[in-house]
From Swiss-Prot:
Record PTM N6-succinyllysine, positions in chain: K42, K49, K73, K97, K106, K244, K260, K319
Catalytic reaction list: a (2E,4E)-dienoyl-CoA + NADPH + H(+) = a 4,5-saturated-(3E)-enoyl-CoA + NADP(+); a (2E,4Z)-dienoyl-CoA + NADPH + H(+) = a 4,5-saturated-(3E)-enoyl-CoA + NADP(+); (2E,4E)-hexadienoyl-CoA + NADPH + H(+) = (3E)-hexenoyl-CoA + NADP(+)
Sample GO molecular function, one term: identical protein binding
Residues the record marks as active site: Y199 (proton acceptor)
Principal localisation: mitochondrion
Signal sequence, start to end: none
Residues spanning the membrane: none
Oligomer and partners: Homotetramer.
CDD domains linked: TER_DECR_SDR_a (cd05369)
EC number(s) stated in the UniProt entry for this protein: 1.3.1.124
Residues involved in NADP(+) binding: G66, G67, G68, T69, G70, L71, R91, D117, K214, P240, G241, P242, I243
Protein name, UniProt field: 2,4-dienoyl-CoA reductase [(3E)-enoyl-CoA-producing], mitochondrial
Biological processes annotated in GO: fatty acid beta-oxidation; positive regulation of cold-induced thermogenesis
Length: 335
């Protein structure tokens, strides 16, 4: 699940036997506290600053859909901090302009805001022309615009299905193809990045439209990685696990009921932060990753492998119970 949000780390050092609550998130539908059930999180503290050199994107242009909030805003902030001239797009121009001004005032680099509904191919066409006019052909293209909600599939309407697939699959295709054609015409390469989800590969109940659309996005990017490398373009994918944002959690966990369950199935013992994902995104879009093409990077603290293992729930077995189990196993004769 791409659940992205603004992170706030205020952990207090304690003895290993009593890590105590650590506040990681102060924004969202519900404040999350790390519990004593996940003391291992102290070994996996998030690094919230950019890892690349400050000039890694100097002279480069980055285009980010869904760039006004959440993960899109975080990636834009990191790219701008590292020298890129950024162009952000979404439907809400007021939010975009506020984000552009906020980031530009911090980094000193230009951030342009363009209103675009990625579901509308004509609007995407005009947006790409404006992008090229104000900033030039992009070196980085991040398809981050998304939509999702939870629902039993038998309750879905055609409009519910269409709402998600139009944004996620069709919108990504319109943006990618429109920019790609312009780049081919200009004989210019670029790094494309798609933000999907860990269940794009496995499928998931109750988010069937999103799962289907994200799976299509991954197939599209892998196909273009094979086809358009000859034009200097490469395509990679990040599958985020649970990362908290107000926008995502308000639709996927509106009561805050499932946060602890999420942490319980993440071996690293905490949710991810948007800064960590922004670091991964900037690396994949940088020249340092010029030989990475067609890759799918799972970014979930180990959640997927935990859920895949038949016996991983045995972590709840106590030492005393293991002593009993071992004794019973040793007494077993034959096959």
């Amino acid at each position: 699940m791409a659940l992205l949000g603004r992170a706030f780390f205020a952990g207090v050092s304690r003895l290993p036997c009593d890590p105590g609550p650590q506040r990681f998130f102060s924004f969202g539908t519900k404040t999350l506290y790390q519990s004593k059930d996940a003391p291992q999180s102290k070994f996996f503290q998030p690094v919230l600053k950019p890892m690349l050199p400050p000039d890694a994107f100097q002279g480069k242009v980055a285009f980010i859909t869904g760039g006004g909030t959440g993960l899109g805003k975080a990636m834009t902030t990191f790219l701008s901090t590292l020298g890129a001239q950024c162009v952000i797009a979404s439907r809400n121009i007021d939010v975009l302009k506020a984000t552009a001004e906020e980031i530009s005032s911090k980094t000193g680099n230009k951030v342009h805001a363009i209103r675009c509904d990625v579901r509308d191919p004509d609007m995407v066409h005009n947006t790409v022309l404006e992008l090229i006019k104000v900033a030039g052909h992009p070196d980085v293209v991040i398809n981050n615009a998304a939509g999702n909600f939870i629902s039993p599939s038998e309750r879905l309407t055609p409009n519910g299905w269409k709402t998600i697939t139009d944004i996620v699959l069709n919108g990504t295709a319109y943006v990618t193809l429109e920019i790609g054609k312009q780049l081919i015409k200009a004989q210019k390469g670029a790094a494309f990045l798609a933000i999907t989800t860990i269940y794009a590969e496995s499928g998931s109940g109750f988010v069937m439209p999103s799962s289907s659309a994200k799976s299509g996005v991954e197939a599209m990017n892998k196909s273009l990685a094979a086809e358009w490398g000859r034009y200097g373009m490469r395509f990679n994918i990040i599958q985020p696990g649970p990362i908290k944002t107000k926008g995502a959690f308000s639709r996927l966990d509106p009561t805050g009921r499932f946060e602890k369950e999420m942490i319980d199935r993440i071996p690293c013992g905490r949710l991810g932060t948007m800064e960590e994902l922004a670091n991964l995104a900037t690396f994949l879009c940088s020249d340092y990753a010029s030989w990475i093409n067609g890759a799918v990077i799972r970014f979930d603290g180990g959640e997927e492998v935990f859920l895949s293992g038949e016996f991983n729930s045995l972590k709840k077995v106590t030492k005393e119970e293991w002593d009993i189990i071992e004794g019973l196993i040793r007494k077993t004769k034959g096959s």
